[in-house]
Amino acid sequence: MSVISKYVSLKNYIPTGLPKETDFEIKSKEISINDEKNILVSNSWISVDPYMRARMTERKNYKPPFKIGEEMEGYAIGKVELSNDKDFSVGDLVFSSLGMRDKFVCSSDELKKLKPIDMPIQSYLGPLGMTGHTAYIGLFKHGELKSGQTILVSSAGGSVGSTVCQIAKNLGCKVIASTGSDEKVDWLKNELKVDHAFNYKKVENLVLHFKEICPDGFDLYFDNVGGDFLESAIFQMKTYGRIVICGRISQMNATNPGSGLKNMAYVLVKRLTIKGFLIFDHDNEREPFETEMSKWLADGKIKFKETIYEGIENAPKSFIDLLNGKNIGKMLVKIDFRKFVIKKPQ
């Protein structure tokens, strides 16, 4: 049996600047199971994440560049359509890193069977997936956040940032949230109940703004953007404060990345700790996160919002819009229009 797979490929590398839809191509090819790749999967949901931008250049990074003309990759949830593997059955819902395509064939070691949950399956790409895990590990392992502390979160209207805000509130922290639109400010204030949210695009001087809204300073800054925002935050960190570097979305597409931080003296004077981390280094640390996040979700203490584009043809647009900040919460591409919910056995 063979089927046609539609997929997104990169037409050329993008060393600087924002990607354009013309940098991508929707292609098709015939696929079929064989002795080595003996499972056929149809994707239902594809995760769209900022880290993918780093794979669109030829520069050495923590993941290799996408191959020109071949299938791009990304996290996805799908359903087994055909299987010659004893461990997977038709209808099984699975997680893989073989996104950016509607169908694929693979071996069993490329799939993870999903556990039963009483919520939509795309939660495994959001609060129960890399999004939630990144927020959890960043806050507790690297940020060492404690109850009652004050935290600044940039890109707080995105998937990771909004999860960081809610975990910190659950811990009894004061949360200052920065985002790029009034709509996101409203969501952060009125639904997620952060202590203060602001649209950074409307702030003329971030350093003065930080002094005004948080005169005592920040214990922790969860940095998703880098650049000038990071430099401004350093001025208002408390002595022995911590800065966790999770992303640098403000610089990913810059044609001129600038000269770097000009206030490193404050890192010395304030005895700050600045630490970067990659969630890919923590795959073996999921159990405590999954237990706690599942409880928060069940208790309604973590809310998640999604921005959804339909069809593999719209995957390039979804990625470009993500980089332009047009998403609220998690950016997803919906491939299979059937709605799957995994139910726990009664």
Annotated model-derived regions:
Residues 30-48, 56-100:
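Glycine-rich beta-strand-centered segment in the early N-terminal region that forms part
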Residues 228-302, 335-346:
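Glycine-rich phosphate-binding loop and adjacent beta-alpha segment
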Residues 169-232, 280, 284:
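Adenosine-nucleotide cofactor-binding segment
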Residues 2-5, 301-308, 316-346:
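C-terminal capping/lid region of NAD(P)-dependent oxidoreductase domains
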Residues 157, 161, 165:
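N-terminal Rossmann NAD(P)H-binding glycine-rich loop of SDR-like oxidoreductase domains
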